Amino acid sequence: MPAASDKPVVTRFAPSPTGYLHIGGGRTALFNWLYARGRKGTFLLRIEDTDRERSTPEATDAILRGLTWLGLDWDGEVVSQFARKDRHAEVAREMLARGAAYKCFSTQEEIEAFREAARAEGRSTLFRSPWRDADPTSHPDAPFVIRMKAPRSGETVIEDEVQGTVRFQNETLDDMVVLRSDGTPTYMLAVVVDDHDMGVTHVIRGDDHLNNAARQTMVYEAMGWEVPVWAHIPLIHGPDGKKLSKRHGALGVEEYQAMGYPAAGMRNYLARLGWSHGDDEFFTSEQAMDWFDLGGIGRSPARLDFKKLESVCGQHIAVMEDAELMREIAAYLAAARKPALTDLQAERLEKGLYALKDRAKTFPELLEKARFALESRPIAADDAAAKALDPVSRGILRELTPMLQAASWSKQDLEAILTAFASEKGMGFGKLAAPLRTALAGRTVTPSVYDMMLVIGRDETIARLEDAAAA
């Protein structure tokens, strides 16, 4: 049988639908997606919904939306772990038949009494079932669980692509339950059965699952199945080095969409969070697929850095195709529950992207810079801009308007007219630009007056100048 690493790569992302898609989960999904896509492999999605009390359809929908926004497409249908419970129970019974598991009739009260006595005597509280080697003829007619018969001596060794060689002393591991008394499988069994049946070759997940790998390896070996390649990645910490929590900022992937970060920038940043390719900070998803490997993942927790996130996102906005940028802005507005752009606003915004997209790190920032293109007359000036509209400035705007009406409305012609007008009036261009910015945008900081005029067009420009002159 070929080693897992020699077979076509199959990875999976297997979240529990008990809440939103956490940013850490988004990064785990991304690493699995990149590893599979870069090797022409398969990326699968499984929803681990065996906890019926906490799992909700709404949480599943939120996970799917988060993955879709990130652009992480999966192969085939989404697998429900709960729907496979009969298969899990079948494997538990097969382990029983193989002698790799046994029926345990100990009650919860008996187990707790054992642990209390062990604590009182200073012994290990690791439960050792008296039913492990019991003669089946002595089994009572009573409820039972099925426990795996784990080795009690030696060690289980995990060769991890990130953590290196990790050794677990078998004497420290108990005989875990694989099937409950009500016939439902435990998570630890279900994960292994699903990964085996789905053909998963590489298990890439958070290092909080590292201890599980030892027990899960025992299940693989008990069933004679090939053990996958393990890669346990460090968790994400806050900027202060502590475990990521709400006080550090947004935790859910969808929150980042609603805050206006571009998906490509988010993918780039999350890929770089704990993985590196030399000194490269900015890269496309295609480059990440080519470059990504498990050896580039560090063992230390990565720290979330919002300044770096914004820097990377700004670079992605600057190079995005206009049509793609418009689609993402529309999706951002919907996610943030903000009004959609009107046809006129969208037309003006797309026309002005050339002057806007290299100046913004997020979509809200871009839209703020595009206010001149999105607002309707009359344009309300803020306090700073209003100071530029004194009686002299209004007179200048009245004189300038007829000259602009005759312009061809090219950038060259507009530059020539405004430069000549400023020269004729004996003023620097900045002196002329200030009232123009107020009239066109109501702000003191704007794109160039030429760009604003070109974006909103002749009629709107003249109407705004006339409004300001008459104010």
From Swiss-Prot:
Subcellular localization(s) per the UniProt record: Cytoplasm
Chief localisation class: cytoplasm
Highest rank taxon of the organism: Bacteria
The protein's Enzyme Commission number: 6.1.1.17
GO cellular component: cytosol
GO molecular function: ATP binding; glutamate-tRNA ligase activity; tRNA binding; zinc ion binding
InterPro entries xrefs: aa-tRNA-synth_I_cd-bd, aa-tRNA-synth_I_codon-bd_sub2, aa-tRNA-synth_I_CS, aa_tRNA-synth_I_cd-bd_sf, Glu-tRNA-ligase_bac/mito, Glu/Gln-tRNA-synth, Glu/Gln-tRNA-synth_Ib_cat-dom, GluQ/Sye
Cystine connections: none
Reaction(s) catalysed (UniProt annotation): tRNA(Glu) + L-glutamate + ATP = L-glutamyl-tRNA(Glu) + AMP + diphosphate
UniProt motif ('HIGH' region) ranges: 15-25
Parts forming coiled coils: none
HAMAP family: Glu_tRNA_synth_type1
PANTHER family reported for this sequence: GLUTAMATE--TRNA LIGASE, GLUTAMATE--TRNA LIGASE, MITOCHONDRIAL-RELATED
Subunit and partners: Monomer.
Family: Belongs to the class-I aminoacyl-tRNA synthetase family. Glutamate--tRNA ligase type 1 subfamily.
Official protein name in the record: Glutamate--tRNA ligase 1
Species the sequence originates in: Cereibacter sphaeroides (strain ATCC 17029 / ATH 2.4.9) (Rhodobacter sphaeroides)
